[in-house]
Structure formats: structure tokens, C-alpha cells
Amino acid sequence: MKSFQAAALAILACCLPAFPNSTAQEAGAGQFQIPASDDGLPGAGPIRRYPWFQNLWQIKRSGWAKRVEADKGAVVFLGDSITQGWGDEMGGSFPGVKVANRGISGDTTRGMLIRLQEDVLSLQPEAVVLLMGTNDLEEKASPETIAANLKLILAELSKHDPEMPVVLSLVFPSSASKSRPAEAIKKINQLYREVVKAEKQVTVVDTWTLFANGDGDAKKEEFPDLLHPNAEGYALWAAALRPVLATLGFLETEPDDFQNEEGFVSLFNGEDLTGWGFREKKSLKPIKNFDGEQASDDGRYVAINGRLVVTTPPEGRRIQQLWTTAEFPTDFTLKLEFRATPNADSGIFIRRPQLQCRDYLLAGPYKNLERYKPQDWNEVVVEVRGGQARCTCNGEVLEAEFKVPATGPIGLEGDRGQMEYRRIRLRED
């Protein structure tokens, strides 16, 4: 990033490695020089060759080359200055997770493609987290070119290990004043989603909606220069990634030890999908149950350490429902907790009608909740009396008189993003 030149030079001053002699220094620098010409290089679009960027590229990469063995098996974060600025340990945001930061300030998608093998794949990563594309815009690359480079990167990651999880953060909002207008970023993200539609290996996290203001630009309180996040911005990014990393098995690996209140019975045992299944959409006639199975046959619903996870569909949105095999004709109180990734859309079916369960502040419809905790656990309580239900989230009323039929099952919808449910319990009243 041109505007980041001064900071990059400061990084150079403090990060220069100590070589025993000038010959070693020249060899180290030469190994990671940016090719003088684009001829024969993979991908398309800009490769930056400003002197400050070439120096930073060489210093960062020669330093990483000495850490290959130490960083093997890490979750690797690949990106530009936004990633680099998070620090070597990603700000301590993922306790217990071995991480490796491979962000270089100013880098483009093509630059990341060129260095992918040495900087990322040589580490035999357990997973890769991607954030890329904003610098390409400053260099006047088209959204189509940027998305094509992402496609090549994903192909290389899949070729290396088709089972390795890849998490794609959508390009953060910025500003036209930074040569990164909202419409161009939205177009890139649209194309990114199209690229990964059939990629089961890739989980998309909607970090654009997370950060965008009403005009689609970055917010000053999170991006003071309208490009780089401050501590608050990084905290929001970390919170958006943590649920996905938990689903992938890197965080929250211990079972939930919650004990039900007296009179409540668990509808979900925390270990598998016993008591849950698919039903015919119109009649709600049971068509398949998953007793003893950890996941539904399509992998959308998964039991993980006490959490019933509705995973992010590769195609971006896929509407379906998982239902209890039991039905509930009497008055009851249903309690559960949910956690949503940014802009996630799900729902809780009460005998049949759907109570919207979403990342409310972004996805609605209850955008004015004061106690809702984004990307954290929130409690929903549904009290059914006669033909009506009173529904609350963290004690705030969602629906005071929600009409429900005389009997029916409890259901959980999958739509957009990842939604987790836990501590699902019911008391007949």
C-alpha cells in the first residue's frame, strides 16, 4: 500500500536480520528477490516492485525461511498489511492454536500466489486463513482478475491437501478516498463467493458486512485510516473467526459440561444427532433420522463437543431444516443458546412456525436489541402457552404473542453463514 510506505520502512529498520557477513546477506536477499519481469509468472494483474516493498518482501520472507520447521503444522494466515499488522501471534486471539502470520504489507493476490509454496505450503499447514485483494484495487486491477488469482490460490491449496480447511475472509470495506470504492469491493466479494461455490474445503466468513457502514465503507471507529483496523477492528475479526475455528477443531475442544435445571430434558445430547432428523417440507412427515450419527448425511448439521453446528454451505445459502423426531402437544418452556458468525441467518421452528434466529444486529429483524452479543453465546427462551409463544433473547422480548399450532416438533434452520446451538432443553409445563 503506497500510503503504508513510511510504516513499512520503519519495520525494515527494526527487523533487519543479523547476517554474519555481506556474502550471506547478499545470498539471503537474492533468494527472495521479486522477478524483474512478469514473464512466466503465474496469475495475472499487478506485482508490486516499489523499492520499499521489495525490501520488505525480502526481509519478511528470508526470516520466515529460517522458521519453516518451527512453524510446521500451524494455522497459517496469508494476507497483506492487515494480516501483517496483527502480529506474529495474531494478537493472542486464538489461545492454544499454533499460528503463523504470513502477511506482507502491500502484497497483492498475484504476489501471494507467487510466494504460496515457500511461505505457506512448505509449513504443511493444518489450515489456512485468507484475506486478500484490497491492494490489487489500488493498482487498478479488475475484480475479475483478482478473483481469478484467488481461484488459482485455492487450486494450489487443494492440490497440496484437499482435506485441509481454508477460511476465506471477505475483503474488508475501505473507501474511495483510498482507491478502494465500495462497489468494487462488493464486486470482488461477489466473485469470491462464486469461485468457492463448489469448494467444500472453503468456509467463507462475511467480514465485509461485519465492518461496512451504511454506505459500504469502513467505519472510522474501527479503521481510523479507512484501511487498517485498530485494536477494536482486530477484536471483531478474531471474534468472527473463532466459531469457525472451533467447528474445524482448533478451539473449544472440550465437551460442554452444562447441567440442566430441574424439570428440563435435553433435546440434544451433545454427542450425536439422536432424536433429530429430516422431515418432508410440507407435511412434516419424518423421512430420515440421524440417531447415533455425528452428522447429517449431507454434513450440514454436526454435533461437536456439546454444540449442534449448522455449518456454512459452500454455495453461500442453502435453506433446510433439522427437526426433532418427537412432537410437543403440551405447554412447554424451551431454552437454548446460539452463536452466529457475522450476518448468519438461521431459525428456530416452534411446532412449525419459524422464529428468526440470526446475527440480529447485522441480519435483523431485531436490530435494536441491547443485550445481544455478536459472535458470542446468547440465550433464547420460548414459553408456549396454548396457541401462543413468548420468545426472548437474553431477556429482551423478540415476540410477545407468537402464534403456534396445537402440536409439532422443534426445528433448526440452515440458511446463510454458520449457526451453533447448545444446551437445547425443554420442560413440559
Task: Enumerate the predicted regions with their spans.
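Charged, glycine-enriched surface loops/patches
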Residues: 147-169, 187, 191-202
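N-terminal secretory targeting modules
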Residues: 1-77, 83-88, 92-93, 123, ...
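Acidic/histidine-rich helix-loop elements
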Residues: 41-54, 87, 95-111, 138, ...
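Oxyanion-hole/transition-state-stabilizing segment in secreted/luminal serine hydrolases
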Residues: 83-100, 109-151, 156, 167, ...
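Solvent-exposed loop/turn segments at secondary-structure junctions
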Residues: 81-85, 105-109, 134-139, 172-176, ...
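Carbohydrate-interacting regions of secretory-pathway proteins
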Residues: 151, 198, 251-429
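Structural recognition of the beta-strand scaffold that forms the well-ordered cores
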Residues: 74-78, 99-103, 127-132, 165-170, ...
